[in-house]
Amino acid sequence: MKKALALVVLVCSVWACEPRTDVVEGEIVQRMAHSDGALVAIVARANYGATVPYVYRVYLQSSDSSISAEILRADRLIDIYVEWEDNNTLVIRMRCGRIFKFKNFFYVTGTDGQLLAQIPVILDTEGLCDSESSF
């Protein structure tokens, strides 16, 4: 019960010190809910035209979709997906790609600004892709 209450508080205040948006940009290609359903990790793909590769973003979002925060932005990648390794760790797996933005942690704060939890984010990748023909 204590864990459930803590998670509810976590979701209600998860993005107190992070830039926020209520818009997930692009086509959603994967959703992975946290085991308790309070948080959702989202992989989205945006197409900006024929001369540039797809841009992929990973967001953490509250289950009611009221707020979301971008934690990864990359392009020229192969095979991206997300999974919850345990109750508090998000793993982003991609074979390779160019990474423009990545946060390896996510602070969860209360409405009063007090730190409630820190969610580690692990990026599992082999680095840059060998050839542009792979995309």
For each of these PLM feature ranges, what is it?
Residues 15-16:
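C-terminal motif of bacterial Sec signal peptides marking the signal peptidase cleavage site
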Residues 24-61:
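N-terminal secretory signal peptides
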Residues 27, 66-71:
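A beta-rich soluble binding module of mature secreted/lumenal proteins
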Residues 46, 63, 95-97:
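Solvent-exposed coil/turn segments that connect beta secondary-structure elements
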Residues 4, 74-135:
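Acidic, small-residue rich beta-repeat scaffolds with periodic aromatic anchors
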Residues 23-24, 72-74:
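Surface loop/turn motifs at the tips and blade-to-blade linkers of beta-strand repeat domains
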Residues 59-68, 111-114:
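Surface-exposed loop/turn elements that mediate protein-protein interactions on large endomembrane-trafficking
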Residues 5-9:
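Sec-dependent signal peptide hydrophobic core
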